[in-house]
A protein has these predicted regions:
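Charged helix-capping and loop-helix junction motifs
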Residues: 48-52, 84, 108-113
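Structural beta-alpha unit
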Residues: 62-94
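Glycine-rich, Arg-bearing micro-motifs that act as flexible, cationic patches
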Residues: 96-119
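Short, flexible loop segments at boundaries between secondary-structure elements
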Residues: 122-131
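Conserved acidic residues
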Residues: 1, 92, 121
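Small/aliphatic-rich secondary-structure junction motif
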Residues: 1-50, 59-68
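Short secondary-structure boundary segments
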Residues: 35-36, 93, 97-99, 128-129
Length: 131
C-alpha cells in the first residue's frame, strides 16, 4: 500500500506533503507525490518546475521515505489525477491540503478537494496550512 499526496508549491501543498511524510513514516509505506497541470497555459504556478523538483527530491531524500514523484500535463483536473494515481498504486490514504474559499468561489470554480473526497476509493486526510 502507498500514501498518495496531491502536491502544489503553496502553503497548503507544503502542509499536505508534511502530513503525508508523517503518515508514510508511521505506516512504513512509500509516498506517491502527484503534481499535475492541465496544460492550458504556458506558466502554471501549481506545476513544480525543474528547480522545485530538485529541491523536493532533496527534502524527500533526507526524509528516508521511499517516494515517487508523478508529474503530468495532460488536460485533466488535479482531482482526477490524484484519484487515478491512488487507484493505480492501491493507496491506503490520500493526503490533500485545503485553502479557505468563499461560497461564491466554490460555486464558480468547483472544489478539487471536494471531488477527491467524493471520488476516492480510500480514506482522505485533509489538512490546512498554518496561518
Amino acid at each position: 500500500m502507498t500514501i498518495v499526496v496531491g502536491y502544489v508549491p503553496t502553503p497548503e501543498g507544503e502542509a499536505a506533503l508534511t502530513a503525508a511524510l508523517a503518515e508514510a513514516r508511521l505506516r512504513e509505506q512509500p509516498l506517491h507525490i502527484v503534481n499535475s497541470a492541465r496544460g492550458d497555459s504556458l506558466i502554471d504556478s501549481r506545476f513544480v518546475q525543474e528547480r522545485g523538483v530538485e529541491e523536493l527530491r532533496t527534502r524527500l531524500d533526507a526524509s528516508g521515505v521511499v517516494y515517487e514523484i508523478d508529474q503530468k500535463v495532460r488536460g485533466h483536473e488535479a482531482s482526477e489525477e490524484v484519484v487515478e494515481a491512488a487507484d493505480r498504486v492501491n493507496a491506503s490514504l490520500i493526503v490533500i491540503g485545503l485553502r479557505r474559499r468563499t461560497p461564491t468561489g466554490k460555486l464558480i470554480t468547483g472544489s478539487q478537494a471536494q471531488r477527491i473526497l467524493l471520488d476516492a476509493n480510500c480514506p482522505v486526510l485533509a489538512v490546512k496550512a498554518d496561518t
